[in-house]
Amino acid sequence: MTMRIDIATLFPEMCEAVLGESIIGRARRAGKLEIHCHNIRDYTQDKHRRVDDTPYGGGKGMLMQTEPIYNCYQAVCEMIAAKPHVIYMSPKGQPFSQQRAIELREYENIFILCGHYEGVDQRVLDEIVDEEISLGDYVLTGGELGALVVADAVGRLCPGVLSEEVCFTEESHYSGLLEYPQYTRPPVWHGMEVPAVLSSMAPDRIVYVSCDPATLARDVKRLE
């Protein structure tokens, strides 16, 4: 089955601008991956399309209201006739990692909620959210950038999105290691040469050099 990712946001055009390009954009057009960006304002009953209000107990800023978010979520549930795995992009969430991206790839439907303003009414989070994810210990204007990172990292792992599985299984972080140094033409640039052990080989003989200290010496010896 093709994975479907739904993103609930106040700025769907911002998300589409990124997810409509490059590998993810091509995968969407080829039917290898579904991504739908929903404007939360489309699900409010307020005639001014308002989706926020002042928090009880005081405090600065505004909070996103429950109903527009819940209505958007319910609409997606009806579209897919199932309950998606719901992620809320939050500074309180678990740090995102390649391992979590690999695990999320197993879901058929993912719904990502992007917060804004001072956050989201806790009640709707308690009602629909399965997990909260953070990109790190810093503050962003909204959850959109985080949602784009998650959608890209998970989406590129789906079958058929990349040309070959080796494209991502040998990448940095996939197996807990960093990717090996790589080189292309010209053979000399700013006085720096491509390692002779690589430049002297025919293309069909070039293999990767491990970054794992335990196997680095073995791989270099094989290249010599």
Q: Model-predicted segments: where are they?
A:
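N-terminal nucleotide/polyanion-binding subdomain common to many enzyme families
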Residues: M1-C77
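Short, conserved loop/helix-junction motifs that constitute active-site signature segments
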Residues: R4, L104-E106, L198-M201
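Hydrophobic/aromatic beta-strand patches that form the interior of the parallel beta-sheet core
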Residues: D6-A8, H36-H38, I87, I110-F111, ...
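Active-site glycine-centered loops adjacent to acidic/histidine catalytic or metal-binding residues
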Residues: F11, G115, D212
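S-adenosyl-L-methionine/SAH cofactor-binding core of RNA-modifying enzymes
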Residues: Q65-H116
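Structured adenosyl-cofactor binding patch, chiefly the S-adenosyl-L-methionine
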Residues: V120, V124-E171
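Internal, active-site/partner-interface "lid" segment
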Residues: L145, L157-A196
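Rossmann-like S-adenosyl-L-methionine
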Residues: L198-E224
